[in-house]
């Protein structure tokens, strides 16, 4: 499933309890794509066992009807339909949220990459559909061509997580953007080719409700209630229009904007929390909670809220309801000689690779090289192979296109694609791993300059730099001497510099004065030490002794370092370092940095943990990119 990155570890002021450690381990587990893929596969296995041990009970459970409504307006669907058309709307909602976040803050900010991803998404659907049509030509089963088109986002990202650091992080953005195009087109295919007669009045209501959500978002109107009510209106209207309503989730998700937490909103949240701390009343509690919510983009809040339910509830439940197939020797033999099964397997496992690589190569050729993937062709091939995993949407289309024996054959083919996609992507990754280092880096990363997030480049005449000037990799940290997270990160950075000889480190000041009252003075103290050529010694000492940063403490540290204490005292009194600190703060604003620590590695913002393993992986990726330059 689609999982947000894990934030930096929390500083430990005391030994955590067993329950606290268990909670942390659980949260870490649920925030990985691998764990959600494990749940998905477990649900598939459970469905297969249930369908073969108790086939009658399996069918009875999912065909039971559930009705909602009042008076003459009632909606009666089977449990199977509620899951496929109702709960799965939330799955596509989360897909839409992450796609929008990547559009606003990630790789898709480069609109050329967005266009190329759309081309790759279309190519990776057209070729598999054509293969299915060729295999089923002249048969009634040819109308099920849509079954071979779609990629299962949950499984694809889970497979990508299994390969881990062997593949570039930007491949995830590529897979996600292709998957969104895939899902959009697949849902349009469902609406046009596999839905009942479309009723235009109800469809118009759905479009108007979507426009209302978009306009309210543009107007900056906050609040989950109106969005939830209008989303339900969209879903019901699409159902009444004869269109599979799962498209509602994706459409609403891409309308929810993502953005970094603005500094002003964070400072307001801190002020409201301090007021609550002084007077813990229900009214101030409500204000503090609202202030915290306002500081985080609705995109991130909604994904955080829905992601665990989707990853570990809805998607496995969908698999349990749809993957139950009665397996027997004759049934399997019939399936593997069936044009339906063969069309799906060949279309997904082979056609996805051909369609993805071929469409991107054609786009590069026809554009004269202006449209180039921001990953290497090896990564593109792996992405195409991983995209061959068909499950969620393919099962939806199969349930609409087939029945009886053909439906069972389609389900078997869809399950086979999961194994085929994994084995194919593993084989391609293994071959790439055998290449010499420089060729492997180019195959994985390509030759396109990555997007730069750091607005103000490193200047050796201005910045505080530790490490060789000729270093291949530059790590920039925006930090606060009173921030406990920065204190936790400092030994990690020192370990990184100790084990990586071609890395240099840059410290830039970002004192969070609203929560750390001594941070500004500490930053100025480090600059006063820099005027006596002892910046890094003072830097290390301040982060080591974060709980003692008052003016007398700073003067004592100056004495310990052998500085001219009177000169140091006068520099602090005159605030000679304030201008330099303000320049760093201004550069942080330009780079949309609002919290500490924030790391940039060769100009790219580092998202995720800042333990030694995570930073080492990020540095290695930056080094490989430098090798391809």
From Swiss-Prot:
The lineage of its organism: Bacteria, Bacillati, Actinomycetota, Actinomycetes, Kitasatosporales. In the N-terminal section; belongs to the NhaA Na(+)/H(+) (TC 2.A.33) antiporter family. This is Na(+)/H(+) antiporter NhaA 2. GO terms for biological process: regulation of pH. GO terms for molecular function: sodium:proton antiporter activity. It comes from Streptomyces coelicolor (strain ATCC BAA-471 / A3(2) / M145). The gene is nhaA2. One of its GO terms (cellular component) is plasma membrane. Residues 443-624 form the Thioredoxin domain. Its main location: membrane. Na(+)/H(+) antiporter that extrudes sodium in exchange for external protons. Residues 1-442 are annotated as: Na(+)/H(+) antiporter NhaA. InterPro entries: Na/H_antiporter_dom_sf, NhaA, Thioredoxin-like_fold, Thioredoxin-like_sf, Thioredoxin_domain.
């Amino acid at each position: 499933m689609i999982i947000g990155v894990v934030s930096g570890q929390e500083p430990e002021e005391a030994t955590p309890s067993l329950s606290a450690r268990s909670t942390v381990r659980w949260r870490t587990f649920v925030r990985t794509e691998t764990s959600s893929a494990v749940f998905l596969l477990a649900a598939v296995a459970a469905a297969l066992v249930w369908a073969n041990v108790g086939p009658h009970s399996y069918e009875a459970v999912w065909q039971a009807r559930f009705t909602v409504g009042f008076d003459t307006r009632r909606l009666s669907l089977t449990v199977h339909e509620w899951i496929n058309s109702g709960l799965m709307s939330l799955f596509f909602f989360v897909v839409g949220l992450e796609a929008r976040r990547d559009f606003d803050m990630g790789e898709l900010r480069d609109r050329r990459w967005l266009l190329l991803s759309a081309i790759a998404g279309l190519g990776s659907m057209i070729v598999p559909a054509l293969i299915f049509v060729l295999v089923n030509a002249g048969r009634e089963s040819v109308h099920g061509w849509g079954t071979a088109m779609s990629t299962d986002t949950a499984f694809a990202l889970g497979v990508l997580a299994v390969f881990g650091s062997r593949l570039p992080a930007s491949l995830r953005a590529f897979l996600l953007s292709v998957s969104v195009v895939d899902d959009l087109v697949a849902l349009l295919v469902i609406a046009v080719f596999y839905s009942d007669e479309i009723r235009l009045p109800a469809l118009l209501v759905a479009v108007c409700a979507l426009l209302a959500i978009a306009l309210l978002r543009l107007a900056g109107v906050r609040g989950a209630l109106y969005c939830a009510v209008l989303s339900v209106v969209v879903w019901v209207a699409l159902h009444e229009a004869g269109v599979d309503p799962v498209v509602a989730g994706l459409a609403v998700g891409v309308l929810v904007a993502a953005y970094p937490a603005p500094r002003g909103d964070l400072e307001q949240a801190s002020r409201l929390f301090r007021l609550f701390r002084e007077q813990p009343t229900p009214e101030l509690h409500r204000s503090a909670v609202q202030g915290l919510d306002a500081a985080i983009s609705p995109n991130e809040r909604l994904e955080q809220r829905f992601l665990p339910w989707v990853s570990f509830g809805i998607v496995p439940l969908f698999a349990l309801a749809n993957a139950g197939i009665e397996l027997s020797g004759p049934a399997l033999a019939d399936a593997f000689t069936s044009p339906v099964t063969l069309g799906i397997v060949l279309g997904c496992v082979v056609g996805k690779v051909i369609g993805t690589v071929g469409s991107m190569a054609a786009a590069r050729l026809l554009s004269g090289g202006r449209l180039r993937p921001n990953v290497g062709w090896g990564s593109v091939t792996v992405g195409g192979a991983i995209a061959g995993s068909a499950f969620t949407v393919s099962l939806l289309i199969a349930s609409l296109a087939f029945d009886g024996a053909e439906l069972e054959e389609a389900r078997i083919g869809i399950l086979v694609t999961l194994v085929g996609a994994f084995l194919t992507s593993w084989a391609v990754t293994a071959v790439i791993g055998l290449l010499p280092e420089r060729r492997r880096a180019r195959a994985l990363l390509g030759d396109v300059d990555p997007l730069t997030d750091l607005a103000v480049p490193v200047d050796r005449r201005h910045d505080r730099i530790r490490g060789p000037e000729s270093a291949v990799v530059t790590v920039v940290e925006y930090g606060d001497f009173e921030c406990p997270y920065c204190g936790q990160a400092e030994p990690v950075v020192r370990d990184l510099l100790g084990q990586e000889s071609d890395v240099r480190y840059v410290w830039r000041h970002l004192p969070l004065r609203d929560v750390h009252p001594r941070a500004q003075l500490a930053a100025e103290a480090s600059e006063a030490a820099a005027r006596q050529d002892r910046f890094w010694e003072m830097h290390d000492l301040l982060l080591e002794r974060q709980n003692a940063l008052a003016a007398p403490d700073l003067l004592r540290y100056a004495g310990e370092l052998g500085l001219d204490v009177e000169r140091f005292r006068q520099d602090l009194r005159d605030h000679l370092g304030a201008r330099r600190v303000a320049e760093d703060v201004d550069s942080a604003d330009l780079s949309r940095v609002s919290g500490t620590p924030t790391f940039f590695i060769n100009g790219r913002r580092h998202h995720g943990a800042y333990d030694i393993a995570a930073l080492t992986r990020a540095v290695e990726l930056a080094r490989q990119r430098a090798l391809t330059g």
